[in-house]
UniProtKB/Swiss-Prot annotation:
Residues 141-168, 649-659 have a biased composition (Basic residues). One of its GO terms (biological process) is development of symbiont in host. Residues 171-180, 377-394 have a biased composition (Polar residues). Keywords: Coiled coil. It comes from Plasmodium berghei (strain Anka). Residues 125-184, 340-405, 609-697 are annotated as: Disordered. Residues 340-357, 610-648, 660-686 have a biased composition (Basic and acidic residues). Residues 581-646 form a coiled coil. This is Ookinete maturation protein 1. Disulfide bonds: none annotated. The keyword Coiled coil applies. In the mosquito vector midgut, plays a role in ookinete development. Disruption phenotype: Both female and male gametocytes appear normal and fertilization proceeds normally. Meiosis is normal. However, ookinete maturation is delayed. In A.stephensi mosquito fed on mice infected with knockout parasites, the number of oocysts in the mosquito midgut is reduced.
């Protein structure tokens, strides 16, 4: 094919400045002279030289420019031949040693020229042994003959690179074959080069390496692909080159395939003489950057005057080439278009042929893509018209690039669609009808789905996964089929319950099932008939084992029964697949539902029809009965009231017309719609049948419902409070483990808390119950609203707080009482089985022993009193116990005290006063929490009375306050009325609870004593009052 010439791109370096105007005048004159020589020489000489070089596999050239110019070493690997010419300022000749690895004895002597222009010839692989005509060689020879005339001149010639392909090794350029006749150019396959540049500190020491390897990058990539290490800082004045890259395109398929194979297997892995470079570069980048850097680096070693002369010589030749080559490019573009149109037609034909063919390998598929890559190399040359004569840079039209991109995208889409069709046919079934063979591939990873059992898409994804043994797969299929059968049986049992009552539905079910069976039999007969028409068919089943090997199993289907048995087995396993063979192209696998599923659908439709009919009949019967009853009741009511009879409006019967229309259209109503209509009709009928109750009864029911709801809400609140108590006690127990045993925490200290705390002590009644500790509960019903947090212990302040009980809501008071009641109920059940209490540091047995010593010490006094008073005396032991508080009769009683002492103990006592063995400790030990609850209930009754008397005048209100104050004092001390005391009407005893009597046996007395098992301060009555007084 014809060669295409790339226009030269020239770029001016901004860092160089001219010396003076005198030098510029001299240089312009030299340019004019050289232009005249060039034009004359082109007209006279038309003959071009040609060289034929032997076919070479891999070419890699390493050129090392060293400070000493005499040393030049060219190394080649694997049948490589390199010829180069290097010269110095002197007129000495330089010979080149060309080494061939295959033939160590052969040395070739290329042509040696006396002139100073240096030329490097890069040799490429030539597969077809074709010869080409190089335009560059003719131009170089013209310049040589010019410079023979001017031997006295000391101009430094231009360093150039020419890329050639020649026929054989024997016709290497020498003195003998310079004047060989011209040969016509032939089709040549060119593979791209990858050029690597290694930048060193010294510009003269510059290494260049050229490897013929397959380049993945496009040839039109910009210069910015270079890494930072590859960018060259010092460039010449004009950044360009005169030589031209030759791009050859072919239409022959055989040549294209051979080039592709060689592109992948060119580089030798065991190259030792080459340097390893990490960065690659395209040919275009090398043409733009590589040679200019080399020229600039080599020229800097010479004088500055010679350096500038060579640059202007490059400028003159570039101007000529731009004018000549652009005209050539326009003619070449017309040829390229014609050639590409022919190529596209051939390409379409080839694609149609490959679609019909099957069994191609993946390597051949990839070859089509690589052919397209080579043919698309010429697309960048379509835009040559966009290059301007004097433009330093390449300007590409955007419209042309967008068009090419769209074409590429459309071509890729078509290719992907074609490949997908091939894969489906190859993976599922590869058939060749002419040979009458069927290839069916069965993979072990296939899993059945409910809708489509084969699952083509899932099969492709799971091919790369782990393989499953055939035995496991067979077991899974059996398990799956058994489950389906069980589910079907359950559904039938559930739905036959409604069908048993109706006789006519059974006949309908049988008819539908028979119809389904007939359809299935007809389909089977059709498939079997097609098989009979055809002759012997070989079914080859390809199974892939874990090792990757394939096993072929041939089955001759001369007899139809064998095929039938396979189909039956599949249907029993739940697959339900049928294979239908088409005469044209391939086997299509169609997944069908099982017989059982078809039966179920028929059953569902019939059962729904039966349910609707039942519902309609029941509605009719009920409506008729209710209408008759409602009419009779209306007549009775009118007779009792003496009113005239009113016409009774019958209800409209709905859903009859709608159901008929829906059934006509083929729509089946669902069961739950009919049930909803039933419920609505029943509710409406019940509302009519109910008699209107009396107003009084309704009001009572409403009140009872309201009370029940309020009780439920309160119970929920109580449960929440108790849950909070359990959580807080766990936290406190953790803290107290690390506390000192001597220091006791004040539980009632509420300075740092947002809620009020109260404690209730539940004391054990016998010594056997000492192991159970006391229980402490707290309540957060009332938030702290008082401004003064530190309240004193004076009695006046406590009395004032009692009057604030009127401002407390009644619901909150009732809630407290419910909490107390619930606590007591729990104690009766759980106190003996669980310890839901906090346990203090000091041991229980030690405390109990101290109490027993105190009691045994007083045993002598007890016996003295027993002798003094006989059993017949009116003051017997049963009457005169330790807890009798009458000072008139028992002045020497240890536990006798008056009202003031008890009052002081309750209100003005401190922790230091409660020492083990004191009378006040023992008295308060006997105090029971039931009295506290009674006090709270009494207080509630007082508050209710006060609210009722709020509307009375002020005088009555003040009196009620006085009496209320007195009552509160007595309630605090828990005193009885004076009238109840028979001994003295002016004196009120202290009726402390649980008065125990002494018996003759002291051990019985000790077992029945009420004791406090732990050294804990008992609760004051004032703290119980705080529940009421808190606000």
């Amino acid at each position: 094919m014809n060669r295409t010439h790339m226009p030269n791109n020239h770029k001016i370096h901004e860092g160089i400045n001219m010396k003076s105007s005198i030098n510029e005048v001299k240089k312009s004159k030299r340019i004019e002279k050289e232009l005249s020589y060039v034009t004359n020489s082109t007209k006279k000489k038309s003959k071009k030289k040609q060289t034929n070089i032997k076919k070479i596999g891999d070419v890699s050239v390493n050129i090392e420019n060293i400070n000493i110019p005499n040393n030049l070493n060219l190394y080649t690997d694997n049948e490589s031949v390199v010829s180069s010419k290097y010269k110095k300022k002197k007129k000495k000749k330089k010979k080149l040693n060309i080494y061939n690895n295959n033939d160590n004895s052969k040395y070739l002597k290329p042509q040696v020229v006396k002139k100073k222009n240096s030329k490097i010839i890069f040799l490429h692989h030539n597969e077809n042994n074709t010869s080409t005509h190089s335009g560059e060689s003719s131009k170089f020879q013209k310049l040589k003959k010019k410079k023979k005339i001017k031997k006295g001149t000391k101009k430094k010639s231009i360093n150039k690179i020419s890329i050639l392909k020649h026929k054989s090794h024997e016709s290497f350029p020498s003195t003998q074959n310079e004047n060989t006749p011209e040969l016509e150019p032939k089709q040549v396959n060119l593979s791209p080069l990858e050029i690597e540049i290694n930048k060193t500190n010294d510009i003269d020491k510059h290494g260049l390496e050229i490897n013929k390897t397959p380049s993945t990058q496009n040839f039109n990539d910009p210069i910015n692909n270079l890494d930072n290490n590859e960018k060259i800082k010092d460039r010449g004045l004009f950044h360009g080159i005169d030589n031209i890259y030759e791009n050859y395109i072919t239409n022959d398929k055989e040549n294209m395939q051979s080039v592709i194979k060689n592109r992948h297997y060119i580089i030798d892995k065991n190259e030792q003489n080459e340097q390893a470079y990490n960065n690659d570069m395209n040919i275009t980048n090398f043409i733009k950057n590589g040679n200019t850097n080399k020229n600039s680096n080599n020229d800097k070693s010479a004088n500055s005057n010679d350096y500038n002369k060579n640059l202007f010589c490059e400028l003159t030749e570039a101007i000529e080439n731009d004018g000549i080559e652009q005209t050539c490019n326009r003619n070449i573009n017309i040829r390229l278009k014609e050639e590409k149109e022919a190529e596209e037609e051939e390409r379409k034909k080839n694609e149609d042929e490959h679609i019909l063919e099957n069994g191609k390998s993946n390597n051949e598929d990839n070859s089509f893509d690589k052919k397209d890559d080579l043919t698309n190399l010429g697309k960048s040359f379509k835009n040559n018209e966009s290059f301007e004569l004097n433009s330093p840079q390449k300007n590409i039209r955007k419209g042309s690039l967008d068009g090419m991109r769209k074409k590429k995208i459309s071509e890729k889409k078509m290719k992907t669609k074609i490949k997908q069709k091939k894969k489906r046919q190859n993976n599922i079934n590869d058939t060749t009808i002419g040979k009458k063979k069927i290839y069916i591939k069965e993979n072990n990873n296939e899993r059945k789905s409910s809708g489509l059992i084969l699952g083509f898409k899932k099969m492709k994804k799971k091919l790369s996964g782990k393989r499953i043994d055939q035995k496991k797969e067979y077991k899974e299929k059996e398990i799956y089929s058994d489950k389906l059968k069980d589910v079907i049986k359950d559904k039938k049992k559930y739905k036959k319950k409604d069908i048993d009552d109706i006789s006519f539905t059974k006949d309908i079910v049988k008819e539908n099932v028979k119809g389904v069976d007939r359809d299935d039999d007809e389909k089977k007969r059709k498939t079997i008939g097609q098989d009979e028409e055809k002759e012997k068919i070989e079914i080859i089943i390809v199974k892939k084992n874990e090792t990757g090997t394939e096993e072929e199993i041939k089955v001759e289907t001369d007899e139809n029964p064998k095929v039938k048995t396979k189909e039956k087995c599949k249907i029993e396993n739940g697959e339900g697949c049928k294979i239908a063979i088409d005469e044209e192209n391939s086997v299509f696998v169609e997944a069908e539902n099982m017989k059982n599923e078809a039966k179920l659908e028929a059953d569902v439709i019939i059962i729904e029809d039966a349910e609707l009919r039942k519902d309609e009949e029941e509605d009719k019967s009920k409506n008729n009965e209710k209408d008759s009853k409602s009419e009779e009741r209306d007549i009775l009511e009118t007779q009792m009231a003496g009113k005239e009879e009113k016409p009774v409006l019958k209800k409209k019967k709905k859903n009859k017309g709608k159901q008929r229309n829906r059934e006509g259209k083929g729509v089946v109503e669902k069961g739950y719609d009919a049930k909803r209509e039933k419920k609505e009709n029943e509710e409406k009928n019940k509302a009519n049948t109910k008699m209107e109750p009396n107003d009084s009864i309704e009001q009572k029911d409403k009140l009872s419902n309201v009370q029940n709801m309020s009780n439920i809400v309160k119970n929920n609140k109580v449960n929440k409070i108790l849950e909070k108590y359990i959580i807080s006690k766990k936290e406190e127990n953790l803290k107290r483990k690390y506390m000192n045993t001597k220091k006791f925490m004040d539980i009632l200290d509420i300075s740092e808390k947002k809620f009020k705390i109260d404690t209730i002590n539940f004391f054990p009644h016998t010594i056997g119950q000492v192991c159970y500790s006391d229980i402490y509960f707290f309540f957060d019903t009332y938030e702290k609203e008082l401004k003064k947090s530190n309240t004193g212990k004076n009695t006046i302040k406590l009395m004032k707080k009692l009057f604030k009980c009127e401002y407390i809501e009644m619901n909150n008071m009732e809630l407290i009482l419910q909490i107390f009641d619930k606590i007591i109920d729990k104690l009766k059940k759980e106190l003996k089985t669980e310890s839901i209490v906090k346990i203090y540091d000091e041991e229980e047995h030690v405390i109990a022993s101290k109490i027993m010593k105190y009691k045994n010490g007083n045993y002598d006094k007890y016996m003295y009193n027993k002798k003094k008073y006989d059993s017949n005396n009116e003051y017997s032991i049963s009457e005169n116990n330790l807890f009798n508080q009458n000072p008139l009769h028992h002045q020497n009683n240890l536990f006798g005290c008056n009202r003031n002492k008890l009052y002081n103990i309750i209100f003005n006592s401190s922790q230091g006063e409660y020492i083990m063995g004191s009378h006040s400790f023992l008295i308060l030990q006997q105090w029971n929490d039931e009295y506290k609850l009674a006090m709270l209930r009494d207080k509630l009754e007082q508050i209710k009375k006060r609210k009722q008397n709020m509307n009375d005048p002020i005088a009555k209100y003040i009196k009620s306050l006085k009496y209320g104050f007195i009552d509160s004092l007595f309630s605090i001390c828990c005193l009885y009325d004076c009238k109840k005391n028979d001994n003295d009407a002016s004196y009120c005893d202290f009726p402390l609870p649980s008065q125990n009597t002494f018996y003759t046996n002291t051990q019985i007395h000790l077992d029945n004593m009420n004791l406090n098992s732990e050294r804990i301060l008992p609760m004051k009555i004032t703290k119980a009052v705080q529940i009421l007084a808190s606000s």
